[in-house]
């Protein structure tokens, strides 16, 4: 679908990675229960907000559905008697707000379909599993050599992506992973160019990219088949998790997660960087690197879901790099994502936030120096190293790789130009989103500063000074006016003195009465 084409009927080009925030604005009593009015907002614009009304029982159901994550969420306890009391309702409302905050601020919980339905029922009312089954059934009717073994429910975080374990009837012992995914808001390739790009990916056979065996795209979705790794992803390896389990169960609160040995960090990191360099040199943009998108096959790391950028689905780490305006290219996004991945390989968990200037104690100082070059405040402001510069760091430069020949992806000039145009459009959308977010943050800081106690005191002092200055100026004005009024009489007196002449005086006669009367 090109930029000028309209999306398929009923299709919503919604970016599921845009954060949702929720604030309980009020509560209302209706007969035997209380309803809470929740204001939900997508992104930073207050114009993109709506209200949902929820009862305590709805919050309780949400909490129960999220218990699989292994995290104790701060849901206020139930109360059967006295639950209509005004003070109790106010206290419960504060507790429910804390419950919502803990969910919307958690990077995995906030992306779950259960939470999205709770906060945004209008946009998440579709049954994506049913839609995927319909699409997959149509595919199997056209290609009978494939057979579905079982659906793999909730193994990935994407709401609009479903997985199935399948087999090839001609090779019944082999297992394959079929995924169906809805095309996303960053799809900027035309249908024809997208088909050419997917054909290119299915033809690739290089060490550091997971092979894509089959692909089929429609106007609104794509169906993909690749080998299934029983050992799971790199994140499964770090978390000591089984690949077929729910992602919330595996990754929200892993009990056995552990960082890798230095030798593994060096080898895996170098192989992943070589995979990124291969894509960049071929003009193929990625932007979706994380430990769940890397599999380890006999000691070799392979990048998965390379097609995500072409299909237009948003990056899992988009909320993390969007606030950082220096990360505004797909290559920069890949380096940023590599920093996240390297941190997780080192410490056994992803970083809580970025920029990051303080690191836990680590036995590998060489790793920390590379992390600082990517994730520190200075790096995020001034710029990060390129993939080639990372390969040349002491941490990765001495890693011995097995292949001897130079790897490359041969892309036709027409497709390369289409990929370049799509890449520029993707980066333009990111930069526009960063601009809007930057303006919002500046406005928020200004408003916060304006309302701070220190600023209020400063304005009061300034107002007093202005008041005193104004009073002083008023006094001066009165004095000047008085001087002006008396100035006329003074001038007349001076004038009469200067023009005095004796001749103008009238002659007067007087009787001399000094003599005594006789």
Regions found by a protein language model. Give the residues of each.
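Conserved short submotifs of the Hanks-type protein kinase catalytic core
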Residues: 220-233, 237, 241
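Terminal C-lobe "cap" of eukaryotic-type protein kinase domains
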Residues: 377-407
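Catalytic-loop of the protein kinase fold
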Residues: 276-297, 303
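Short beta-strand micro-motifs within the conserved protein kinase catalytic domain, predominantly
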Residues: 211-222
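Regulatory extensions appended to serine/threonine kinase catalytic cores
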Residues: 402-486, 492-496
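Phox homology (PX) phosphoinositide-binding domain
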Residues: 1-187, 196
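Activation segment signature within eukaryotic-like protein kinase domains
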Residues: 268-269
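C-lobe/activation-segment region of protein kinase-like
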Residues: 302-304, 308-370
């Amino acid at each position: 679908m090109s930029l000028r084409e309209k999306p398929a009927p009923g299709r919503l080009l919604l970016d599921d990675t845009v954060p949702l925030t929720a604030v309980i604005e009020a509560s209302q009593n209706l007969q035997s229960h209380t309803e809470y009015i929740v204001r939900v907002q997508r992104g930073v614009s207050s114009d993109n907000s709506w209200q949902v009304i929820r009862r305590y029982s709805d919050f309780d159901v949400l909490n129960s559905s999220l218990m699989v994550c292994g995290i104790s969420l701060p849901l206020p306890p139930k109360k059967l008697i006295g639950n209509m009391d005004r003070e109790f309702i106010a206290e419960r409302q504060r507790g429910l707000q804390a419950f919502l905050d803990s969910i919307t601020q958690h990077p995995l919980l906030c992306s779950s379909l259960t939470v999205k339905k709770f906060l945004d029922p209008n946009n998440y009312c579709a049954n994506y599993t049913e839609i995927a089954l319909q699409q997959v059934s149509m595919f199997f009717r056209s290609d009978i050599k494939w057979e579905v073994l079982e659906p793999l429910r909730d193994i990935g975080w994407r709401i609009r992506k479903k997985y199935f374990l399948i087999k090839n009837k001609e090779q019944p012992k082999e297992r394959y992973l079929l995924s169906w995914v809805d095309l996303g808001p960053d799809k900027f390739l035309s249908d024809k160019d997208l088909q050419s790009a997917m054909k290119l990916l299915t033809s690739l056979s290089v060490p550091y990219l997971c092979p894509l065996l089959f692909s089929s795209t429609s106007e609104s979705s794509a169906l993909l088949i690749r080998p299934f790794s029983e050992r799971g992803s790199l994140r499964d390896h770090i978390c000591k998790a089984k690949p077929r389990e729910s992602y919330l169960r595996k990754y929200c609160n892993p009990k056995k997660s552990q960082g890798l040995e230095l030798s593994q960090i060096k080898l895996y990191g170098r192989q992943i960087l070589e995979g990124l360099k291969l894509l960049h040199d071929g003009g193929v943009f990625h932007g979706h690197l994380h430990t769940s998108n890397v599999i380890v096959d006999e000691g070799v790391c392979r990048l998965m879901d390379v097609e995500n950028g072409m299909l237009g689905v948003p990056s899992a780490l988009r909320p993390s790099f969007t606030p950082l305006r220096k990360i505004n290219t797909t290559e920069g996004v890949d380096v940023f994502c590599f920093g996240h991945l390297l941190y997780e390989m080192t410490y056994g968990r992803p970083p809580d936030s970025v920029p990051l200037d303080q690191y836990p104690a680590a036995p590998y100082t060489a790793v920390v120096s590379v992390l600082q070059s990517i994730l520190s405040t200075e790096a995020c402001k001034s710029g990060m190293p390129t993939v080639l510069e990372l390969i040349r760091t002491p941490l990765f430069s001495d890693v011995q790789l097995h292949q001897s020949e130079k790897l490359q992806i041969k892309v036709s000039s027409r497709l390369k130009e289409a990929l370049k145009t799509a890449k520029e459009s993707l980066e333009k959308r990111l930069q526009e989103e960063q601009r809007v977010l930057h303006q919002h943050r500046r406005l928020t800081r200004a408003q916060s500063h304006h309302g701070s106690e220190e600023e209020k005191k400063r304005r009061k002092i300034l107002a007093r000074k202005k008041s005193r200055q104004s009073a002083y100026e008023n006094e001066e004005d009165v004095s000047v006016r008085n001087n002006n009024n008396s100035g006329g009489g003074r001038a007349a007196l001076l004038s009469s003195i200067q023009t005095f002449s004796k001749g103008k005086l009238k002659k007067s006669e007087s009787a001399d009465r000094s003599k005594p009367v006789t």
